Regions:
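Short, intrinsically disordered, charge-biased short linear motifs at domain edges
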Residues: 13-16, 148-161
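Non-catalytic, well-ordered alpha-helical scaffold segments
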Residues: 20, 100-104, 165
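Cysteine-cluster motifs in flexible loop/terminal segments that predominantly coordinate metals
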Residues: 29, 33, 156-178
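Short helix-capping/linker segments at secondary-structure and domain boundaries
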Residues: 34-42, 110-116, 178
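Active-site metal-binding core of divalent-cation-utilizing nuclease and nuclease-like domains
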Residues: 46-82, 95-98, 131-134
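Nucleic-acid nuclease catalytic cores
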Residues: 79-153, 174
């Protein structure tokens, strides 16, 4: 998606970079992605936020956790022979598509840095693991989503709230329904 020229003219000088959690949020709720782009903090007392962090911290103990590289925050990284494997840990496969696009974003950005990797989605509570390889079609999807997010971030106001099945558990719910 092309970045809207009018929006770009009026944009602040420094846009925050698109990050993986923003891609995930955008798939679920564009308003949440906009709030994240403004560095508005979610409700830190949210039970689901705590549970997700706990699962991530306590699962896969032997693997290298939370590796930061430029604007990327990778949950797990390991080597399998000559291949770098980047994994994203999620509480549930209920948001599988959002998690898949988040991981695809990481693979896309790593490829742009000259780092070849493959991905794994990990759902420890379900004892599931899914492989992900960045192909041309998936790379185009990532580019399109990045463009949509940039256009969203350029907006002065967030999109109006739209109720979906994730609202009840969302740590940003107070910003929509209070």
């Amino acid at each position: 998606m092309e970045i809207d020229a009018k929006l770009q003219e009026t944009a602040p000088l420094h846009l925050p970079p698109v990050v993986g959690s923003m891609v995930n949020a955008y798939i679920i709720c564009p308003r949440k992605a906009w709030l994240m782009s403004r560095q508005i903090c979610p409700d830190e007392d949210n039970t689901h936020l705590h549970l997700g962090r706990l699962i991530q911290d306590q699962s896969y103990g032997r693997e290298r956790k939370e590796v930061r590289l430029e604007h990327l925050c990778l949950d797990l990284v390991r080597r399998e022979k000559e291949t770098l494997v980047v994994a994203e840990v999620k509480k549930s496969s209920r948001v599988r598509e959002a998690a898949r696009m988040q991981l695809a974003f990481y693979l896309y950005e790593l490829e742009r840095m000259g780092i070849e990797a493959r991905g794994e989605l990990l759902f420890p509570e379900e004892r599931r693991r899914e492989q992900l390889v960045l192909d041309e079609k998936l790379a185009r999807q990532v580019e399109e989503i990045k463009g949509c997010i940039v256009n969203l971030v350029l907006q002065e106001q967030p999109p109006p709230p739209q109720r979906n099945t994730f609202c009840n558990k969302c740590a940003y719910a107070e910003f929509c329904w209070a």
